[in-house]
């Protein structure tokens, strides 16, 4: 099990008496230990960027500590306000239903603790730049940039029941294509189009060098499934710990906090 990543707040900022509102970074969770280890590293970077704030990692499912456990700990520490930032790339069931339900129960258990849910990471341009960089690192040097127009990239995501959530992945692929000139297609690990279908579409579009770019924060069973389904193409690394990811999480924190202050004014 992975314990909480936390930093004790010490400095009043923006008119707040000590402590500054905590940040609870909520990851999905996975049966694959690589996923929890990666998210622990991600949140360690987030905490290091602003050591004046109490930062903790929680998981929606399958790993500990749970959201309930972390909220209990934050309340016991004496916090009266925490921002809950979903470490989720899409705004689907977990962000819209699962996490809000958990927070509603937590508010009932701790009426003295204000819990403000921040926005998801989403298709932020900074993350798409990181996706490009991960893909470039996997691309043979002789291919890019001289033959960039013949590169085909499958942007691979989890997949959701929500068409709007899946459309966000298509938007990521469009932005990546605009940024690089690469041919792009999308695939999903849990629904269609599959990775093999997406590769076939790229071949039809005359892509000569095909890679899979996982739109995932961490490796796990689903990224392994993608590799197993398409073992003959190069798979780039997941996003993982990254300066851009850290910046985006703190932007979501600040935006959520500003909104909460406006509502209470």
In which residue ranges do the predicted regions lie?
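Active-site-proximal alpha-helix that buttresses catalytic centers in soluble enzyme cores
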Residues: 1-265
């Amino acid at each position: 099990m992975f314990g909480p990543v936390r930093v004790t707040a010490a400095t009043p900022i923006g008119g707040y008496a000590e402590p500054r509102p905590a940040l609870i970074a909520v990851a999905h969770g996975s049966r694959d230990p690589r996923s929890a280890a990666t998210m622990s590293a991600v949140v360690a970077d987030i905490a290091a960027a602003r050591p004046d704030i109490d930062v903790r990692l929680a998981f929606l499912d399958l790993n500990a500590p749970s959201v309930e456990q972390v909220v209990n700990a934050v309340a016991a520490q004496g916090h009266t306000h925490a921002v809950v930032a979903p470490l989720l790339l899409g705004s689907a069931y977990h962000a819209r239903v699962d996490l809000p339900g958990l927070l509603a129960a937590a508010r009932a258990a701790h009426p003295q603790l204000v819990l403000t849910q921040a926005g998801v990471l989403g298709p932020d341009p900074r993350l798409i730049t990181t996706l490009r960089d991960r893909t470039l690192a996997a691309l043979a040097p002789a291919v890019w940039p001289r033959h960039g127009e013949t590169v085909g990239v499958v942007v691979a995501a989890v997949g959701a029941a929500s068409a709007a959530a899946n459309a966000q992945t298509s938007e990521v692929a469009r932005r990546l294509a605009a940024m690089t000139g690469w041919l792009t297609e999308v695939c999903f690990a849990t629904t269609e189009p599959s990775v093999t279908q997406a590769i076939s579409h790229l071949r039809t579009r005359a892509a000569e060098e095909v890679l899979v770019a996982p739109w995932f924060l961490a490796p796990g069973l689903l990224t392994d499934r993608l590799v197993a389904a398409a073992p003959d193409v190069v798979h780039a690394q997941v996003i993982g710990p990254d300066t851009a990811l850290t910046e985006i999480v703190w932007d979501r924190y600040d935006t959520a906090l500003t909104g909460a202050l406006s509502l209470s004014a």
